[in-house]
Curated annotation (Swiss-Prot):
Organism of this sequence: Rattus norvegicus
Protein name, entry field: Histamine H2 receptor
Site entry (Essential for histamine binding), positions: D98
Cited Pfam families: 7tm_1 (PF00001)
UniProt GO BP: cellular response to histamine; chemical synaptic transmission; digestive tract development; epithelial cell morphogenesis; G protein-coupled receptor signaling pathway, coupled to cyclic nucleotide second messenger; gastric acid secretion; gastrin-induced gastric acid secretion; gland development
Transmembrane segment boundaries: 23-44, 58-81, 93-114, 135-159, 180-203, 234-257, 267-288
Amino acid sequence: MEPNGTVHSCCLDSMALKVTISVVLTTLILITIAGNVVVCLAVSLNRRLRSLTNCFIVSLAATDLLLGLLVLPFSAIYQLSFTWSFGHVFCNIYTSLDVMLCTASILNLFMISLDRYCAVTDPLRYPVLVTPVRVAISLVFIWVISITLSFLSIHLGWNSRNGTRGGNDTFKCKVQVNEVYGLVDGLVTFYLPLLIMCVTYYRIFKIAREQAKRINHISSWKAATIREHKATVTLAAVMGAFIICWFPYFTAFVYRGLRGDDAINEAVEGIVLWLGYANSALNPILYAALNRDFRTAYQQLFHCKFASHNSHKTSLRLNNSLLPRSQSREGRWQEEKPLKLQVWSGTELTHPQGNPIR
């Protein structure tokens, strides 16, 4: 009886673990899809968000949405069964989509950091530096790199050790990695963007602190300290999430290229892979919900008040415009909120004339 009881207990533990993993992966997929759908809807329904700055956020949301729809369901099935049941041809398509969309997601994050670096370090020349043509070129660059490292490399066998497409085991489906592909993909997709993002966000943080000190004479010391704290927390969340989610995966990826595809345990490989996928679920929160305009759009979206809000805002502007300048200045400051270059970090920029931009 004892051996049978032990086997039964192991089966129950295995089933409980599989159910737990299924719930976690399903929740992650639903959050990824729902969060990025909300970002796309917010931009499509709110004209205020249709700006060049938000082009990269929309591109990021669309990329992560495609990842949640086209890749994550098959990854979850494979993770739970440890068996690929969809054939060799679809395996190549699946792995190519996986690499392409993950690469595009990371490169979009990289472009967002460069965009905000230009906005903070040189706000007066920002409209000259960031033009529709340059944004379009940047988006084309993202997808050219992503397609080259995914569909082109995998279907031509550049990533495999023997130069063939796909592996020999028809019941397994994962990206093969040789030395050159592992190093090139790791550097282009993660390590170089990570280095540049660290530099840009450090510069943004320094400027945010300087601005907080500069407006210290206008507002209380406590308010300036709170603004600086918010900027620190936001930047730490953005970089922390990116590093925690992707660093383990690309470390394992490069290690596989150097040591062989079977150098890492499948369970560990699955954990670091889904940790990277989790970044696509966090992006709508980190890059949209922390932005004041996006938060307002989310509230409007969930309460279905786009029309009433816009009409109310228009009436306020018309009423303020009819008042004398001396009488309407304070009301316009609170209600109208003129066109601004908002930095998502939560720290206020300073207008050339000395007025803070909220």
